[in-house]
């Protein structure tokens, strides 16, 4: 019997206030995500063969998208700019088997923007995606989450 394709969870988003009233973003540090596909280890020579390996750092990905949207990325929090600064936090929410015969895994992520001065939650989004590697899945999910937040009206 064939197994049906698993569906990705829909992207969810909650926006309390527009992010566009802020000029700066401080991104909490993230580690790199590395993923491989089609890789096998030979029992003969104990070496890794074939496939594609990709690495991404979520902070770098988010920085690029936010700079395109006109934000200035701060290397550290500046006490003189707190009223105009968002703090971005990123986390992974887990992995699920999706796809034909469960040969694919999705990665879920969550992004939160908080006011640097008050710590109030300004916006958050959860997204999930499935790429050819875990690094691709994370990259696609970040794009979906940020798109969901920034597609909200600029009130």
Feature names for model-found ranges:
Residues 1-69, 154-155:
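A structural "domain/chain start" motif
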């Amino acid at each position: 019997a064939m197994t049906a394709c698993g569906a990705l969870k829909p992207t969810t988003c909650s926006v309390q206030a527009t992010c566009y009233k802020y000029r700066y973003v401080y991104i909490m540090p993230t580690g790199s995500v590395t993923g491989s596909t089609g890789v096998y280890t030979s029992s003969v020579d104990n070496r890794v063969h074939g496939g594609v390996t990709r690495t991404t750092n979520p902070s770098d990905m988010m920085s690029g998208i936010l700079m395109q949207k006109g934000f200035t990325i701060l290397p550290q929090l500046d006490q003189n700019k707190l009223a105009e600064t968002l703090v971005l936090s990123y986390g992974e929410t887990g992995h699920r088997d999706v796809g034909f015969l469960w040969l694919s895994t999705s990665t879920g992520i969550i992004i939160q923007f908080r006011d640097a001065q008050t710590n109030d939650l300004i916006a958050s989004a959860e997204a999930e995606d499935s790429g050819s590697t875990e690094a691709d899945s994370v990259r696609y999910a970040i794009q979906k989450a940020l798109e969901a937040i920034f597609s909200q009206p600029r009130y």
